A protein has these predicted regions:
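Conserved aromatic-histidine-acidic binding/catalytic patches
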Residues: 43, 74-82, 151-158
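Conserved short loop/helix modules at catalytic or binding sites
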Residues: 48-98
């Protein structure tokens, strides 16, 4: 079994005062983190290298008016690849969990490639998810979510390498047919 990195989830009111508290975290600025904004109905998942600045930006965004709380997921071992991957996984799983309606317009910046200690971050994600259940930000365990139809067919789901290659081939062939005027093979 891969190593599990220790994480902490710090929660604050989604307000100017809460943003100031984020600023004073040891990793509130200049450190990669993942965060969740939530109200009673909606949530937003993001990642940033400056939580204080990013929360400030969200406070000015009218789309986030219904948010009441910010949860910052911190880890000493976090790096940009890991936070992008965790963000992507959170969006996929929270969408399928259905506790909140996500305001995310996409699945985050997917990490298709391998990165250092990726298996350890997958184990770490499982621990993060358990903490989110304890905090009321998630309801179902990962096994139940990953076996649900909504997760399997989610629009947030990352394509497999084989699926990605098929999409690229289809786009290439369609482009070629359009450029040559061969409408029969579109």
């Amino acid at each position: 079994m891969a190593e599990i990195f220790e994480t902490v989830i710090e929660q604050f009111k989604f307000s100017d005062g809460g943003a100031e508290k984020v600023k004073h975290l040891s990793k509130g600025e200049n450190w990669p983190v993942v965060y969740i904004l939530n109200g009673s109905k909606y949530a937003y998942v993001g990642e940033t290298n400056n939580a204080y600045r990013r929360i400030g930006q969200h406070l000015k965004n009218e789309k986030r008016n219904s948010m009441k709380r910010v949860s910052i997921i911190l880890g000493d071992e976090f790096n940009k690849s890991a936070t992008l991957d965790i963000e992507n996984k959170l969006i996929q799983h929270m969408h399928a969990d259905r506790v909140f309606i996500l305001q995310n317009e996409n699945a985050g910046q997917s990490v298709r490639n391998n990165y250092y200690q990726k298996e350890a971050y997958e184990q770490t994600f499982q621990e993060i998810w358990k903490k989110l259940i304890e905090l009321g930000l998630a309801k179902h365990n990962l096994y139940a979510i990953r076996n649900s139809e909504i997760f399997k067919y989610s629009p947030y789901k990352e394509l497999t390498e084989e699926q990605f290659e098929c999409v690229e081939l289809l786009l290439k062939l369609t482009g070629r047919s359009l450029s040559t005027g061969d409408k029969e093979n579109i």
